[in-house]
A protein has these predicted regions:
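Accessory, usually C-terminal, subdomains that scaffold auxiliary metal cofactors
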Residues: 161-232
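Metal-dependent nuclease catalytic cores that hydrolyze phosphodiester bonds in DNA/RNA
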Residues: 1-144
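An acidic intrinsically disordered interaction segment
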Residues: 133-152, 212-215, 219-230
């Protein structure tokens, strides 16, 4: 259903198997540092791991790491990755957090930095961003009580993935849920969404779907059976 658009970066990445940070931290790094590159204050971009650090009694250490995220140098990347490890303490709960201390080596740093550069080039073509790190206030239910999205442009709801693979059914269902929750939320910005999109800076590829092409039966099932909105 999605239209596939390869982008133009000819500079290849090192193999994913060479990276010294796990995929979840790589994804968070590209997400948060792309926001920083586009003008979001570092403290705002990293507010989730900062909260997680406070929840596990590491707030002072996290602040020291944040103070070292000043640019896109290797030293800043190391500090950012250490700080991002606290993200899980906020999202999953402090009881599930275990320190990992993942530090990027040269190959990993190159990949992370290149993926941020690809993300900036992507937004030069598909942007500008009108909202990042958005929530679905008013759209949550007893079944889905939390969640936030990546980026919203004028008419497209975007999800960033740094997987080595193409979007799978779980990813597409998640994006559909985000769109439907957005329409049930208090935020008018979602009323302008006409397309759902994935951008994968590792593959440097875009996938786009007009929401008018989504089967109405799938939309109804998502609304009522998955998210839990009442039927009229």
């Amino acid at each position: 259903m999605f239209d596939h658009v390869p982008l133009a970066d000819r500079m290849g990445l090192h193999p994913r198997s060479m990276e010294t940070v796990p995929p979840d931290l790589a994804g968070l790094y590209v997400d948060y540092m792309t926001r920083v590159a586009m003008g979001t204050p570092v403290r705002v971009a990293f507010h989730v791991p900062l909260l997680g650090a406070r929840l596990v009694g590491q707030g002072e250490y996290a602040e020291s790491l944040l103070s070292r995220v000043t640019d896109f140098s290797p030293a800043s990347a190391r500090a950012a990755c250490l700080l991002l490890d606290f993200d899980a303490a906020s999202r999953r709960g402090p009881q599930y957090w275990r320190p990992r201390r993942m530090v990027p080596d040269d190959a990993t740093y190159f990949n992370l930095t290149r993926m941020v550069a690809r993300s900036r080039a992507f937004f030069d073509e598909y942007g500008p961003v009108v909202w990042d790190g958005f929530d679905f206030e008013g759209g949550y239910t007893d079944r889905i009580t939390s969640g936030s999205g990546d980026f919203l442009t004028a008419d497209t709801l975007w999800d960033f993935k740094v997987s080595s693979y193409r979007p799978n059914p779980m990813y597409t269902l998640q994006l559909l849920v985000y769109w439907r929750m957005g329409l049930h939320s208090v935020h008018d910005e979602y009323r302008m969404v006409r397309r759902l999109g994935f951008f994968n800076p590792r593959r440097d590829e875009v996938w786009l779907l007009d929401v008018d092409r989504i089967d109405g039966r799938l939309v109804d099932w998502t609304d009522h059976e998955l998210i839990g909105y009442p039927k009229d």
